[in-house]
């Protein structure tokens, strides 16, 4: 039946092909150039109307493909090709010899014949019906010889040789027999490479992998045939189908170019081998990611995404695979193609994933690649265009990296937009992702723009611009021309009433159009005669955007006060105490005034300040009309003409009646101890100007931070889980103040936080401080719960817990640290063999067990001979070899400055303090001995000697005794064992005396040369009369209590005496008599409380029933 059906199909095919020749000709435009009109057809096509070769070949191919596609076996398809070849031979008699369309049809028929002959062996060639088919093919080839088709001649020769598999060289290659490469290459060059490709496809389809690999390797070794990518694709296919050849797969992968690999992957996917294409894509992609090579990386990632989703449509699996590939990447730029495919394929959730990827990329070390970092910032801004805060931070970060004018314009445009409140519902990412991203973005900023207004941001950004011409252009845009300045001054006179209140509206127009030239002249004359100083600095409130003149911003700050929170209206910093906020705000005003004074002095050398007029003393004006110290400000007037000098004299005449000034140490005493001191009653000196604004600000910040930390601190504290009162650990005086545990330090503090800060900065190596800290924490680290026996070991260990990443890894050569303990635990698991190194210097031993490491480190510190505090307390002060402060001075890396040491000092004002102030005035006035004086004074401040209670050697007291204030007590300067202070009679130009610090070997000589009764000296200088009065030590009863005078004459430190007295007082205290209620048995401390309780008549009997006596 099959043979009959094939015969019928062949007859119908022949009829259709003949009908094509007899069909009417097509349009003239369809005729091919050079095609002739045939006359009577020859052969089976009979005479008829001719048709162009182009139309005939096109319709011929369509009909043959239709009939051949109806069969799935090779023999009927060969019969269809036999009929088609015979009809084409008959119809081609009228076609020209060099027709392109004829050559294409003949080559297609020859290749189709060869592909079908691969299914037959040599023995089948001599059997029917294949013998008749091959005979017809050879006969048609003889008629078509005039066309000279190469493929047709090759197929004819292969048929004569016995078939496509019968060549001896090919047989040797397929059987892996040894053969010369030259012979093989000669055989491969004798045929069309397409024939070898068809043989390889047939062998792979039949799963004859060894023979296919042998043939493919021979073709790859050929210099010309190896250029065909199919043989490389076929080799990958064979290696994929045989898992034993993994090594060959990787080796050939390295030899293949990435661009060729993309073509191979595409061709493999077209053949329907998706898994093979996916593996090939990953094989090419992963090495590129590991090497950081961006060559064709976008194409590979795109192909990988399509193949991955085709093999597994799950979005979650796709995202996980993306993360896995990103972990293997070494070039951060690969995140961009991955974010592109994630955003396109995952849709809504893809945006959040892309933002998280950008955040992770910013945490990498990108200092050497600023361009990539800029691209990441721009990508985040592209993903979150509606989040103004994030877009601003990204634009500012891009400017810091590029420092170009375009980047600055972007920042300026964004910061000029009105602030938008963040809404979680309008955000395209989750709230947690946004708040995790913000700190990461702000790490790259030079400052935090959250607390700065645009004026400060613009000022700092312009300073960072690299292009000088751009900076000049921006400065020219911000400067005003003279006419606009004149108009602004005219407007300032018109709004004089608003200036009197200290407030101006920034929204009002600052330019008023003058009515003619005469009005302008009148305005100028009025301005020249006016005594209003328009150079007063203005301050803009960042909370309400209002502008204020001079110090009115301090009074305005009260309008923004909230319960428990006080914010600075200039920088936005928050405080818990109003006094600290106002002091911080006044520092802003002072700094701006100093900057303007310095600028004016540089611009105009004739500027006159009050320092030149009144001996560098600042006058205090009452801003609010009262004498409250919170409203006091320094008013410094400047002038550049004789008219301004008169204004200054008038101001001096107005304010000379109020010569009130506050010494700096009194204000600092209030800040430190929480209440004003008695020294406020004897204020006699003006506010000194701080030489270093930054140092003052740092000290102020320290106090404010400690205040915030201790504001809510409870009276009872927990020490490693045990409730303990601070007074049980720290020494206290009779008023409950905390004493510094350092040796020789008599500082007293109201709060523990101030004491801890003082001990950290001033006595970091003191033995008593270490022991107190050890006692306070009971020798246990609060971070790692490790127990310590030696105080020095404990302090060294605490220094390793550096904020903010306090949990550090103990592994050898691992410097990782983390914020949370579980992060450290996860990191520790990454070390396959955990080896911890001893932290002691010059010790390199490694341990696998932490208990062994702890025991080993403890041996280092136990082997050292510890100094006991008892030995140090019994040291004789006159011993010349022991200096309790020498070790401290050697180990302090950041010495305390003079101004900072005065803040820490709470001793009464001594002769040294007086000399310090005089020396400061000499330094400011340009004395030639200023350098030596400053160094001596700083040394005196840092090395204060121990104080003894003996009346003969008493130098200062720490408490107020018999109601005397600290200023009234004027003790002598002590003599330190290693430091002798002698007051030489080295007089300066103005008659003041300079103290000098001399060594011990010259101290005796200095004392002998000093006069016994110095006379009173005075000298008239340009800024006042200076009287130098010698210091006379008062008698001990004038400043000591009777109980101190009647004490035994024993040499002890004052701190020990005070402790002994407090302990003795506690021993002799009479026991408190307690009273008890007869009904409820409640105990009371005094009779008044008991009477008040009984008067209420609310207590009941303890057992709830009457006694027998009452019932009777």
UniProtKB/Swiss-Prot annotation:
Chain ranges of zinc fingers (C2H2-type): 566-588, 738-763, 779-801, 807-831, 836-860
Main location (coarse class): nucleus
Bias type Polar residues, positions: 886-899, 1002-1018
Name of the protein described by the UniProt record: Zinc finger protein 654
Sequence positions bearing Phosphoserine: 1107, 1111
Highest taxon of source: Eukaryota
Organism: Mus musculus (Mouse)
Pfam family, one: zf-C2H2
Family: Belongs to the krueppel C2H2-type zinc-finger protein family.
GO molecular function: DNA binding; zinc ion binding
Region Disordered, annotated ranges: 482-514, 885-906, 997-1018
Role according to the record: May be involved in transcriptional regulation.
Disulfide bonds: none
Gene Ontology cellular-component annotations: nucleus
Keywords carried by this UniProt record: DNA-binding, Metal-binding, Nucleus, Phosphoprotein, Repeat, Transcription, Transcription regulation, Zinc, Zinc-finger
Phylogenetic placement of the source organism: Eukaryota, Metazoa, Chordata, Craniata, Vertebrata
Bias-annotated ranges (Acidic residues): 494-508
SUPFAM superfamilies in UniProt: beta-beta-alpha zinc fingers
Gene3D superfamilies associated with the record: Classic Zinc Finger
InterPro entries per record: GH-ZnFinger_Regulators, Znf_C2H2_sf, Znf_C2H2_type
């Amino acid at each position: 039946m099959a043979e009959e059906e094939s015969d019928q199909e062949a007859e119908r095919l022949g009829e259709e092909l003949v009908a094509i020749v007899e069909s009417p000709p097509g349009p003239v435009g369809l005729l091919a150039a050079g095609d002739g009109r045939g006359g009577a057809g020859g052969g089976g096509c009979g005479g008829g109307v001719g048709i162009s070769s182009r139309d005939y070949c096109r319709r011929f191919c369509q009909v043959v493909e239709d009939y051949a596609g109806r069969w799935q076996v090779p023999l009927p398809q060969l019969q269809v090709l036999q009929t088609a070849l015979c009809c084409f031979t008959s119809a081609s008699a009228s076609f020209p010899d060099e027709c392109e369309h004829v050559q294409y049809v003949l080559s297609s028929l020859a290749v189709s014949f060869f592909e079908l002959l691969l299914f037959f062996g040599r023995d089948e060639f001599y059997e029917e019906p294949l013998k008749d088919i091959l005979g017809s093919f050879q006969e048609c080839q003889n008629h078509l010889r005039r066309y000279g088709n190469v493929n047709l001649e090759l197929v004819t020769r292969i048929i004569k040789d016995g078939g496509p598999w019968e060549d001896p060289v090919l047989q040797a290659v397929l059987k892996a027999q040894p053969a010369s490469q030259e012979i093989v290459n000669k055989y491969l060059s004798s045929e069309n490479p397409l024939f070898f490709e068809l043989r390889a496809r047939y062998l792979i389809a039949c799963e004859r992998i060894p023979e296919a690999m042998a043939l493919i390797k021979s073709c790859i070794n050929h210099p010309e045939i190896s250029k065909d990518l199919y043989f490389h694709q076929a080799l990958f296919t064979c290696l994929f189908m045989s898992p034993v050849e993994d090594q060959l797969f990787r080796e050939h992968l390295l030899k293949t170019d990435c661009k060729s690999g993309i073509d191979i992957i595409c061709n493999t996917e077209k053949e329907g081998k998706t898994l093979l294409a996916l593996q090939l894509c990953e094989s090419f992609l992963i090495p590129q990611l590991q090497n950081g090579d961006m060559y064709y990386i976008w194409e590979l990632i795109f192909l990988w995404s399509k193949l991955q989703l085709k093999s597994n449509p799950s979005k979650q699996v796709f995202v996980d695979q993306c993360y896995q590939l990103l972990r293997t990447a070494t070039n951060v730029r690969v995140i961009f193609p991955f974010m592109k495919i994630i955003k396109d394929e995952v849709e809504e959730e893809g945006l959040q994933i892309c933002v998280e990827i950008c955040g992770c990329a910013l945490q990498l070390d990108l200092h050497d690649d600023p361009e990539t970092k800029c691209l990441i910032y721009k990508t985040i801004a592209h993903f979150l265009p509606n989040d103004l805060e994030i877009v601003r931070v990204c634009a500012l970060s891009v400017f810091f990296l590029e420092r170009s004018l375009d980047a600055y314009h972007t920042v300026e445009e964004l910061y000029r937009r009105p602030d938008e409140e963040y809404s979680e519902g309008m955000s395209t990412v989750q709230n947690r992702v946004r708040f995790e991203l913000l700190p990461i973005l702000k790490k790259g900023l030079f400052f935090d723009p959250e607390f700065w207004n645009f004026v400060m941001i613009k000022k700092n950004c312009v300073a960072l611009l690299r292009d000088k011409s751009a900076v000049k252009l921006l400065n020219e845009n911000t400067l005003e021309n003279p006419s606009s300045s004149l108009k602004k001054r005219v407007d300032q006179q018109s709004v004089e009433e608003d200036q009197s209140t200290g407030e101006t509206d920034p929204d009002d127009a600052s330019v008023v159009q003058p009515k003619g030239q005469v009005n302008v002249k009148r305005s100028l004359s009025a301005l020249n005669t006016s005594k209003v100083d328009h150079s007063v600095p203005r301050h803009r409130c960042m909370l309400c955007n209002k502008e204020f003149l001079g110090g009115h911003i301090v009074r305005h700050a009260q309008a923004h006060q909230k319960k428990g929170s006080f914010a600075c209206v200039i920088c936005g910093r928050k405080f818990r105490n109003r006094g600290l906020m106002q002091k911080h705000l006044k520092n802003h005003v002072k700094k701006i005034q100093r900057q303007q004074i310095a600028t004016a002095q540089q611009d105009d050398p004739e500027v006159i300040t009050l320092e030149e007029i009144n001996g560098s003393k600042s006058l205090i004006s009452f801003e609010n009309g009262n004498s409250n110290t919170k409203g006091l400000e320094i008013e410094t007037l400047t002038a550049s003409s004789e008219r301004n000098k008169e204004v200054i004299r008038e101001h001096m005449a107005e304010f000379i009646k109020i010569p009130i000034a506050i010494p700096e140490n009194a204000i600092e005493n209030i800040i430190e101890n929480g209440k004003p001191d008695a020294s406020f009653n004897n204020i006699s000196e003006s506010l000194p100007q701080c030489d270093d604004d930054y140092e003052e600000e740092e000290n102020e910040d320290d106090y404010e931070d400690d205040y915030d930390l201790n504001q809510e601190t409870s009276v009872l504290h927990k020490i490693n889980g045990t409730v303990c009162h601070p007074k049980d650990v720290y020494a206290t005086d009779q008023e409950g103040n905390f004493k510094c545990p350092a040796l020789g330090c008599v500082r007293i503090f109201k709060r523990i936080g101030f004491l801890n800060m003082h001990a950290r900065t001033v006595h970091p190596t003191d033995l008593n401080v270490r022991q107190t800290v050890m006692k306070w924490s009971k020798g246990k680290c609060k971070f790692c719960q490790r127990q310590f026996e030696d105080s020095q070991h404990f302090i060294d260990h605490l220094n390793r817990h550096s904020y903010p990443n306090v949990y550090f890894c103990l592994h050898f050569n691992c410097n990782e640290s983390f914020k949370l303990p579980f992060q450290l635990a996860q990191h520790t698991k990454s070390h396959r063999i955990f080896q911890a190194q001893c932290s002691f210097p010059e010790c390199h031993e490694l341990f696998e067990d932490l208990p062994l490491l702890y025991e080993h480190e403890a041996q280092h510190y136990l082997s050292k001979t510890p100094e006991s505090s008892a030995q140090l307390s019994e040291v004789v002060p006159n011993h010349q070899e022991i200096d309790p402060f020498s070790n401290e001075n050697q180990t302090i890396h950041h010495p305390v400055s003079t101004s900072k040491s005065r803040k820490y000092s709470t001793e009464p004002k001594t002769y040294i303090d007086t000399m310090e102030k005089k020396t400061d005035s000499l330094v400011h006035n340009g004395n030639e001995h200023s350098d030596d004086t400053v160094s001596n004074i700083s040394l005196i401040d840092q090395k204060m000697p121990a104080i003894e209670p003996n009346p003969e050697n008493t130098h200062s007291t720490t408490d107020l005794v018999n109601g005397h204030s600290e200023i009234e007590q004027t003790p002598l300067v002590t003599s330190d064992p290693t430091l002798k202070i002698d007051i030489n009679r080295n007089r300066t130009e103005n008659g003041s005396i300079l103290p000098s610090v001399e060594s011990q070997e010259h101290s005796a000589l200095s004392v002998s040369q000093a006069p016994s009764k110095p006379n009173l000296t005075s000298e008239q200088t340009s800024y006042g009369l200076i009287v130098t009065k010698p210091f006379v030590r008062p008698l001990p009863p004038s400043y000591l209590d009777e109980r101190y005078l009647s004490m035994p004459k024993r040499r002890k430190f004052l701190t020990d005496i005070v402790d002994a007295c407090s302990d003795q007082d506690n021993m002799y205290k009479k026991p408190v008599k307690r009273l008890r209620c007869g009904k409820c048995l409640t105990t009371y401390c005094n009779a008044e409380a008991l009477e008040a309780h009984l008067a209420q008549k609310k207590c009941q009997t303890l057992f709830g029933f009457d006694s027998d006596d009452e019932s009777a």
